[in-house]
Amino acid sequence: MKNKMKRMAFVGGATLLGIALVLFFIFLGNRSSGPISEILTTLGNKVTDVEHNLLIRGRIPKRVKALHWFENKRNNPDFLRYPDTLLLGVYDNNYIKSFDNIIHFDKMLKAPLPLIQVYVAWGEKDNEKFPMLYAKAIYDLGSLPLITWEPWLNDFDREKHHLPKVTDPNKNGMKAVAKGKYDFYIEKWAENAKAFGHIIFIRLGHEMNDPYRYPWGPQNNKPEEFIAAWQHVVQVFKNRNAYNVIWVWAPQPAYLHYKEYYPGNRYVDWVGVAALNYGTVAPWSKWWSFKEIFGNYYNRLAVFGKPLMITEMGSLTVGGNRTQWFKQAFDSLPEKYPQLRSVLFFNDNNDNTTLNKSLDWSILYDTATCKAIRTSIRTTWKFSPEKQETDTIR
């Protein structure tokens, strides 16, 4: 209770300071340029640091101890480009507020997760910059960040950066990226990635062959334009000596022609794919088993010769037994899918990207499902959590 009161006091103080900064900015208006603006920005960053450190403070030593087996491996690029064990990870949409859910999920699985995923869109807003604070916090917790980096091109000041004024900047956007039109942004990301100083996984422009989802897809770009853009981005990172990035290419194999978007072995380290069971939530969906989803894609993706990653694994509850779905999935992984080397749970409890209603994929408080996964990991898998001191997770 005492620690909780301290936390509330710190958070309250940080919030009040943040409000004061905002009001100060409003008062100053255009006069806040120059040194004053820089000072206020620094103060704002300090507020974020205090708040963020407060939210994870006290958990770091226990979680790092439980991930001791991963400590040396997470700084070994050769291991991370083809690990000899399966790396679990998670995305939780509430990470922006805190890592409490992720730490609780560790406890539910009795296995702290080596990878933590965040999503960042391209643009000039604060939340579209390299997520240094989150990356550092993830590393401090003993894990590594996987950043899904989404090349939306709407949030750039086109006049400031001498970009042509167009109705839709995403139309032929990958061609513009390949020509270096957005290097002012990509270079800054590369510099910050290098400054982070640790290995990062980046999933760039995922599901690029899906004509219905994202603007970097075939409705706006040709396959060769996407490839050229991908190769250009990777080369910019190399030119900035950001060799600590591991690149994850993640198509949507449910649509044909995904092979046409492959950037080449020199530019790809991992191949990723989502495995999401929508059940009967929509007229176009049905209850699919894990085998019917991932099993249908496995051989197609394995031919690239790269380690495979399930970047989003989840199932809704409508139309079947979710606990059984996960159990069958994890029971099948070691033998049937040997090239699969990473699985990231998709714990999004407010997903509104597919339907006009919110979907809850999270298994955070699904005790039966977490127990089934935990049992499967420990009884059928030669998996590193067997070596972990899981009783240190609280």
Show the residue positions of the predicted features.
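Eukaryote-skewed repeat-based solenoidal scaffolds used as protein-protein interaction platforms
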Residues: 194-197, 217-277, 294, 298, ...
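Glycoside hydrolase catalytic-domain groove-lining segments
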Residues: 131-150, 261-319, 364, 372, ...
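N-terminal substrate-binding region of glycoside hydrolase catalytic domains
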Residues: 60-182, 315-318
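Hydrophobic membrane-insertion alpha-helices, especially the h-region
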Residues: 10-27
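Substrate-binding cleft of secreted/luminal carbohydrate-active enzymes
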Residues: 26-97, 309-394
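Aromatic-lined carbohydrate-recognition surfaces of secreted/lumenal glycan-active proteins
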Residues: 90-91, 205, 230, 234-257, ...
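Substrate-binding cleft of extracellular glycoside hydrolase catalytic domains
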Residues: 133-245, 392-393
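Alpha-helical scaffolding within the catalytic cores
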Residues: 96-105, 127-134, 186-189, 251-263, ...
